[in-house]
Swiss-Prot record:
<feature type="binding site">
    <location>
        <begin position="135"/>
        <end position="139"/>
    </location>
    <ligand>
        <name>NADP(+)</name>
    </ligand>
</feature>
<feature type="binding site">
    <location>
        <position position="94"/>
    </location>
    <ligand>
        <name>shikimate</name>
    </ligand>
</feature>
<keyword id="KW-0057">Aromatic amino acid biosynthesis</keyword>
<feature type="binding site">
    <location>
        <position position="69"/>
    </location>
    <ligand>
        <name>shikimate</name>
    </ligand>
</feature>
<feature type="binding site">
    <location>
        <position position="260"/>
    </location>
    <ligand>
        <name>NADP(+)</name>
    </ligand>
</feature>
<dbReference type="Pfam" id="PF18317">
    <property type="entry name" value="SDH_C"/>
</dbReference>
<comment type="function">
    <text>Involved in the biosynthesis of the chorismate, which leads to the biosynthesis of aromatic amino acids. Catalyzes the reversible NADPH linked reduction of 3-dehydroshikimate (DHSA) to yield shikimate (SA).</text>
</comment>
<dbReference type="InterPro" id="IPR046346">
    <property type="entry name" value="Aminoacid_DH-like_N_sf"/>
</dbReference>
<keyword id="KW-0028">Amino-acid biosynthesis</keyword>
<feature type="binding site">
    <location>
        <position position="236"/>
    </location>
    <ligand>
        <name>NADP(+)</name>
    </ligand>
</feature>
<dbReference type="GO" id="GO:0019632">
    <property type="term" value="P:shikimate metabolic process"/>
</dbReference>
<dbReference type="GO" id="GO:0009423">
    <property type="term" value="P:chorismate biosynthetic process"/>
</dbReference>
<dbReference type="InterPro" id="IPR022893">
    <property type="entry name" value="Shikimate_DH_fam"/>
</dbReference>
<dbReference type="InterPro" id="IPR036291">
    <property type="entry name" value="NAD(P)-bd_dom_sf"/>
</dbReference>
<keyword id="KW-0560">Oxidoreductase</keyword>
<keyword id="KW-0521">NADP</keyword>
<feature type="binding site">
    <location>
        <position position="238"/>
    </location>
    <ligand>
        <name>shikimate</name>
    </ligand>
</feature>
Length: 294
C-alpha cells in the first residue's frame, strides 16, 4: 500500500467505536488497489464525544468521504449540511460525502440499498410485495425506508417494546407520509400477529442479530408451518454463513434462503460509488471476504 501513497492520495475513513474490527478498510483498500485509484481508507475510533471534532476535521482536511457506524449513525445527522431522501426518512447516516471537497457534507444511508441489491442478485423483486421485518434497529429501519422508496406494497416491522420501538414508530410515520407503501410496527411479543404477517408475506427479513454469537443456537422461527417454498428467508447475519434460522428454513422447504454477506458487500459498494464515483469490483471483494473467513 505504501507505494500507492502520494501527495495526491485522497483519504476516506470509518468513524465508529469500536472501529478496529471492521471489514470496511479491507474492502475499500482492496478495491482501490484493484482499480488503481489513488485513495486510502483508514479506521478511526470515534464515539459521540469526539464526533463533532471529527466532522469538522473532515471539512478542514478535505477528507472526501467517511463511513459511519455505531454509535454515531444518528448523532451525526445534525452535524451535516444535507441528507439524502433515505437518510432523512431513516434519521440516520452510514456514509458521508464531502461533495465539493470544500466541506459541504451530505449524509446517505446505504444499508437499505445494499439489502435490496442483494435480493435483486438472487432474483427477488420487492415492488408491490408484502414484507415482514423482525428487528427495528438501524438496519431494520433503513431497509424499511428503502423498501418504501422502491415500491413495496406493505412493510410490517416487528420489535420488542423498547426505546427502539418508539424511534421506529417515527421512521414508519415518515415512510407512510413520503412513499406509497403501507408501513406498520407491531410488538414482536405478539406471536399471533407475527405468524399471520409471515404467512401473508413473500419475504421475511430477520434484522435482530439472533443467530450470531452468543445466540447462534436460537431462531425466531421454530414452527415448520411458517416456512413455505415461496417464502424468501433473508437473515442479515453473515457469520455464521448459515444461521439456525436459515438451516431451519432450508430443511423445511424454503427454496430461497439468504445470509447478510450480499448486503454487506452492496452497502459497501454503494458507499464506494458515492465517495469515489467508481463501481466497486464486487465479485473480487466477495472472493476476498470469503477467503478471509476460511
Amino acid at each position: 500500500m505504501l507505494e500507492r501513497l502520494s501527495g495526491h492520495t485522497r483519504l476516506t475513513a470509518l468513524l465508529a467505536a469500536p472501529a478496529r474490527h471492521s471489514l470496511s478498510p479491507k474492502m475499500h483498500n482492496a478495491a482501490y488497489a484493484k482499480l488503481g485509484l489513488d485513495y486510502a481508507y483508514l479506521a478511526f475510533e470515534v464515539d459521540n464525544s469526539g464526533l463533532a471534532a471529527a466532522v469538522q476535521g473532515m471539512r478542514a482536511l478535505g477528507i472526501c468521504g467517511a463511513n459511519v457506524s455505531m454509535p454515531n449513525k444518528q448523532a451525526i445527522v445534525p452535524l451535516l449540511d444535507e441528507l439524502s431522501p433515505a437518510a432523512a426518512l431513516a434519521g440516520a447516516v452510514n456514509t458521508v460525502v464531502n461533495t465539493d471537497g470544500k466541506g459541504h457534507l451530505v449524509g446517505h444511508i446505504t444499508d437499505g440499498t445494499g439489502a435490496i441489491r442483494s435480493l435483486a442478485e438472487e432474483g427477488v423483486a420487492i415492488k408491490d410485495q408484502i414484507i415482514t421485518i423482525a428487528g427495528a434497529g438501524g438496519a431494520g429501519t433503513a431497509i424499511a425506508v428503502q423498501l418504501g422508496l422502491d415500491g413495496a406494497k406493505e412493510i410490517r416491522l416487528f420489535n420488542r417494546k423498547t426505546a427502539t420501538f418508539k424511534q421506529a414508530k417515527q421512521v414508519l410515520k415518515g415512510i407512510n407520509a413520503k412513499t406509497s407503501a403501507l408501513a406498520s410496527l407491531q410488538d414482536l411479543a405478539d406471536d399471533r400477529a407475527f405468524r399471520r404477517s409471515i404467512a401473508e408475506s413473500s419475504i421475511y427479513i430477520d434484522a435482530t442479530g439472533v443467530g450470531m454469537k452468543p445466540l447462534e443456537e436460537h431462531s425466531l422461527i421454530t414452527d415448520p408451518a411458517l416456512i413455505r417454498p415461496d417464502l424468501v428467508v433473508f437473515d442479515l447475519v453473515y457469520h455464521p454463513a448459515e444461521t439456525k434460522l436459515l438451516a431451519f428454513a432450508r430443511e423445511h422447504g424454503a427454496k430461497k434462503v439468504m445470509n447478510g454477506l450480499g448486503m454487506l458487500l452492496y452497502q459497501g459498494a454503494e458507499a464506494f460509488k458515492l465517495m469515489t464515483g467508481e463501481d466497486m469490483p464486487v465479485a473480487y471483494i466477495r472472493e476476498l471476504l470469503c477467503r478471509n473467513k476460511e
